[in-house]
């Protein structure tokens, strides 16, 4: 069994995301002064009185409207309710009870899950008692005055929440691979996530920009656990207004940094765009392992040579990511989706790989014997004394040389290729740090190591 789940529900714009941010101590949920900002159900880790649990922020619940995303949001709320240990209904203490609140309360009373009532926006403790008293008419549990902004009353709310948990908390820390799903809007990231999870976890819609929160979902396959981060689509900044989508894009960049492996989703119909190239550069700058996922492959008219032609086109546009493995899939039909996790496993393993100094220097000696370092116009030849891995995630190797300026880009790329071919750094960037060092310092360090041995 997993952690207890607490579902946060309520009509639009009552401050659910603000309250979730307060209860979890995080600033992940997008908060913006317009209704309907949260669309998917979003999971946040929380801790109170030594009990770990998950808070689920859901979209604003409206029953009598079929426009845009509202039917999808209702479906998400119902799924959250089905898996929750306890539900917290959030209402607006400043607005007072509304017909929508009554409708939601009536629906919740018909469910089997226990319900707590949080009266939000009670910024003054004195006025909060009066504001909360109005909500007895909803015929739920005692109305609890809280303030998502200032934190008033949140401790009392959490005290009641944890009372619904079982007496045997699970505190096992499972190793997991953190995977970020990134790409331009409407390339099929949420459809891929749903294919992995096996349910409509994220709102899937042909309207560009549907997902605006980063959404975490844990998936288990065999003994391996994966934490998928479904991010907002990334588009050119000049095409993004200052609002929820702006914040979602910035959080997508944070999701890349938070991940170990990035599933970079590309639309097979559009190919690699200029924005895709910039996003690829972002992944490399952040030093993350990567798998290129070419989605919507079912929509492409194919013959015997199609996949090779597409591969060449994509590789030529992303020639600086030649180390990333590529797979052609269809989230719609499920074609090859399961194989993505095999590539994730490989990329994550190589991302964390550590190689002994002796093996690194064997590769260097072989590389130099086949292709000696260049000589400058002044007759000075570059010399590589030795190399050693200084960190992983991504693998980073320091090369100690007589003068880094003697080694131009073409020779540096050659050395990187030798490491990749001999040490199998598939799916991960590697960083080479070229460090100047005088020969006598190298000899002294070598002698010191020999003496200690």
From Swiss-Prot:
Keywords: GTP-binding, Nucleotide-binding, Repeat, Ribosome biogenesis
Pfam families: KH_dom-like, MMR_HSR1
Signal peptide start-end: none
One GO-annotated biological process of the protein: ribosome biogenesis
UniProt-recorded name of the protein: GTPase Der
Family annotation (InterPro entries): AAA+_ATPase, G_ENGA, GTP-bd, GTPase_Der, KH_dom-like, KH_dom-like_a/b, P-loop_NTPase, Small_GTP-bd
Organism encoding this protein: Acaryochloris marina (strain MBIC 11017)
UniProt cross-references to HAMAP family, sorted A to Z: GTPase_Der
Residues annotated to bind GTP 2: 183-190, 230-234, 295-298
Family as reported in the entry's similarity comment: Belongs to the TRAFAC class TrmE-Era-EngA-EngB-Septin-like GTPase superfamily. EngA (Der) GTPase family.
